[in-house]
Amino acid sequence: MPKPEIVFVTGNANKLREVSMILGGDASPFTLVNEPLDLEELQGADLQEIALAKLQQAVHALGPGRPVFVEDTALSFDEFNGLPGAYIKWFIKSMGLAKVVKMLDSFENKGAYAITTIAYADSKGQLHVFQGKTHGTIVDSRGHTNFGWDSIFQPDESQNNETYAEMAKEDKNKISQRGRAFAQLKEYLYNTGI
């Protein structure tokens, strides 16, 4: 009997691989499939509101009864009272990583936190939200630069003062905001089904 499917709406292959690993890969009781839908991103500071708006669009596009989730991640600087937050993707796209780091040059506090918010619609159409958070420091880029801001974020829990980009995926997934949020989703799915 085939495993039930859950749709992850993303066009990011790195994110898909990482999430598949966190959710159990081939050993999970469901199959993770990707739908790279082009969803409008609500602009705002409320991450839960942004994720739920994206989820509503995904449910509309895929049709009711199909389990689906979306994910949104923010990187917030302590000195900027939460900014760039959900806008980090656009800051990096517009300015590049080096200039994003440079924004904190005149501040002693380089503290930051990352938050991942997952909005999930189960097969009955009920909506669920899961969120993970990790504190860290903004540093000059170290490691690969092919996955967002991983190379400029050094989590406080890093054993060797590594950025996400320098860490082994398994180590990163244990302490990252995405790993924490998806661990909650995984627990929900494994305990209640899809």
Curated annotation (Swiss-Prot):
Belongs to the HAM1 NTPase family. It catalyses: ITP + H2O = IMP + diphosphate + H(+); dITP + H2O = dIMP + diphosphate + H(+); XTP + H2O = XMP + diphosphate + H(+). GO terms for molecular function: dITP diphosphatase activity; ITP diphosphatase activity; metal ion binding; nucleotide binding; XTP diphosphatase activity. Its EC number is 3.6.1.66. Mg(2+) binds at residue 41. It comes from Kluyveromyces lactis (strain ATCC 8585 / CBS 2359 / DSM 70799 / NBRC 1267 / NRRL Y-1140 / WM37) (Yeast). GO terms for biological process: deoxyribonucleoside triphosphate catabolic process; nucleotide metabolic process. This is Inosine triphosphate pyrophosphatase. The gene is HAM1. Pyrophosphatase that hydrolyzes non-canonical purine nucleotides such as inosine triphosphate (ITP), deoxyinosine triphosphate (dITP) or xanthosine 5'-triphosphate (XTP) to their respective monophosphate derivatives. The enzyme does not distinguish between the deoxy- and ribose forms. Probably excludes non-canonical purines from RNA and DNA precursor pools, thus preventing their incorporation into RNA and DNA and avoiding chromosomal lesions. ITP binds at residues 10-15, 54, 72-73, 89, 147-150, 172, 177-178. Pfam families: Ham1p_like (PF01725). Keywords: Cytoplasm, Hydrolase, Magnesium, Manganese, Metal-binding, Nucleotide metabolism, Nucleotide-binding, Nucleus. Binds 1 divalent metal cation per subunit; can use either Mg(2+) or Mn(2+). Its cofactor is Mg(2+); Mn(2+). The keyword Nucleotide-binding applies. It is found in: Cytoplasm; Nucleus. The keyword ATP-binding does not apply. GO terms for cellular component: cytoplasm; nucleus. Homodimer.
